[in-house]
Amino acid sequence: MSLQNLTRFPRLEFIGAPTPLEYLPRFSDYLGREIFIKRDDVTPLAMGGNKVRKLEFLAADALREGADTLVTAGAIQSNHVRQTAAVAAKLGLHCVALLENPIGTQAENYLSNGNRLLLDLFNVQVEMCAALDDPDAQLQELATRIEAQGFRPYVIPVGGSNALGALGYVESALEIAQQCEGAVNLSSVVVASGSAGTHAGLAVGLEHLLPETELIGVTVSRSVADQKPKVVALQQAVARELELSAAAEITLWDEYFAPGYGTPNEEGMEAVKLLARLEGILLDPVYTGKAMAGLIDGISQKRFKDQGPILFIHTGGAPALFAYHPHV
């Protein structure tokens, strides 16, 4: 089925060419399985990452609405906030970020290095809060305050994860299908599942482009019971935007994010070290390290549907390594 309705949505061009899809020979030998990686960690802006795909659509909508300020939220070490700030700088917009400290640490490295350091370079107006308990409401309240100061704010949800932003990962599914055509018959795709937009967009795109390929989301912050409704809701919202059906089952693995969001674990850090030492590729302790731990364990536990090639979606996040230095 065609995804031609994607072209109806205004989109800014931040990425340019498709990101590389690479074979990992040494990692594949180590695991005894063909492993490929989609390098969304090397998107052009602000040290790379997946959120730029979403921001191509979201920032276009902000400009269409005449906004002069991007307002968003996340953790102190949020990759999404960093990339939103870079987009704002590139477009000459103001950026206001509502940040929380999800792990409750007072470690200076976490509070000032990594992504947080980059926010200062991008001249972001940072507002701290105790917790993002109801981020949509908190962002609306912040936008109201910003508007009262004479700005024209555009609210971007946590992770850029709404139906419009998730279109960026329908676009990514198109790239993946084109890059694999005639070259590799993917059995499975593995992605970190957090704010759910990346996962949902891929789910819609892959269902229509590579229907025999299973998509597995490795949760980084929630149990399956809590995460699945979020992914399904976005999956259906994206499908409605594109006037498509979305019947693919959402598969999630939740055994790899403990002790909680933003706190590294041993398996995740081992995955970070393994890929660095075998392939010279940097994962991160919060998202991709834990997702890769799921991939590694999934192979050893025979959780994948067959023995075919696996594609890992590298969503970026390496700047956080510097903030988590004692764990690395």
From Swiss-Prot:
It comes from the Bacteria. GO terms for molecular function: D-cysteine desulfhydrase activity. The modification N6-(pyridoxal phosphate)lysine is found at K51. GO terms for biological process: D-amino acid metabolic process. It catalyses: D-cysteine + H2O = hydrogen sulfide + pyruvate + NH4(+) + H(+). Gene3D superfamilies: 3.40.50.1100. It is an enzyme of class 4 (lyase). Its cofactor is pyridoxal 5'-phosphate. InterPro entries: ACCD_DCysDesulf (IPR027278), D-Cys_desShydrase (IPR005966), D_Cys_desulphydr_bac (IPR023702), TrpB-like_PALP (IPR001926), TrpB-like_PALP_sf (IPR036052). Pfam families: PALP. Its EC number is 4.4.1.15. Keywords: Lyase, Pyridoxal phosphate. Homodimer. Catalyzes the alpha,beta-elimination reaction of D-cysteine and of several D-cysteine derivatives. It could be a defense mechanism against D-cysteine. Belongs to the ACC deaminase/D-cysteine desulfhydrase family. NCBIfam families: ACC_deam_rel, PRK03910.1-1, PRK03910.1-3, PRK03910.1-5. PANTHER family: 1-AMINOCYCLOPROPANE-1-CARBOXYLATE DEAMINASE-RELATED (PTHR43780:SF2). This is D-cysteine desulfhydrase.
